């Protein structure tokens, strides 16, 4: 909770990193109001707000980045996976407040700048227009409605945004079910 974050925060806190929709261990989106309150707390305390969009970013949720649907403006956004259609590529975006620390030569890797991956990333970004993102939201709504229409007592809530959806399956399960 926001209260527990405030209670545990010491004077040496400089940033908060959050994954808006937990992708591993169950697909669990955070509440929009909680995320907005956390962003406000970060501004109040002068903490950086870092958003991990490795799984949620690049159109999967129906917007280029999920944070856009939460009504916040992070200081740093990390992204990967979807940016190059499965090829190894990732990156970060920063606001002006943080951009100055990334001077030439301070951010790099011995495995980075693969020309095939960067070409794939460019192709993905060229595809990522508003009609494409609208289709992601429409298809997500269609899937959600179809799953809910099944009406099975074993199927619980359908959660997520866009095409990043999860289904709560109720009842005990074995590896044969």
Task: Give the ranges of each region predicted by the language model.
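Conserved N-terminal phosphate-binding loop of PLP-dependent enzymes in the Aspartate aminotransferase
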Residues: 1-177
């Amino acid at each position: 909770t926001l209260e527990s974050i405030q209670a545990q925060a010491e004077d040496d806190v400089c940033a908060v990193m959050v994954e808006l929709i937990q992708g591993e261990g169950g697909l669990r989106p955070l509440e929009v109001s909680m995320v907005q309150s956390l962003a406000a707390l970060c501004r109040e305390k002068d903490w950086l707000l870092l958003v991990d969009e490795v799984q949620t970013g690049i159109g999967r949720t129906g917007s280029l980045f999920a944070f856009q649907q939460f009504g916040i403006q992070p200081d740093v956004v990390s992204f990967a996976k979807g940016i190059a259609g499965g090829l190894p590529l990732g990156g970060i975006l920063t606001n002006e407040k943080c951009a100055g620390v990334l001077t030439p030569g301070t951010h790099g890797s011995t495995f980075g700048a693969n020309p095939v991956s960067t070409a794939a990333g460019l192709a993905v970004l060229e595809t990522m227009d508003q009609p494409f993102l609208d289709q992601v939201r429409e298809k997500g709504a269609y899937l959600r409605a179809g799953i809910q229409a099944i009406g099975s007592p074993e199927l619980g809530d359908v959660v997520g945004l866009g095409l990043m959806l999860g289904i709560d399956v109720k009842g005990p399960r074995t590896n044969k079910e």
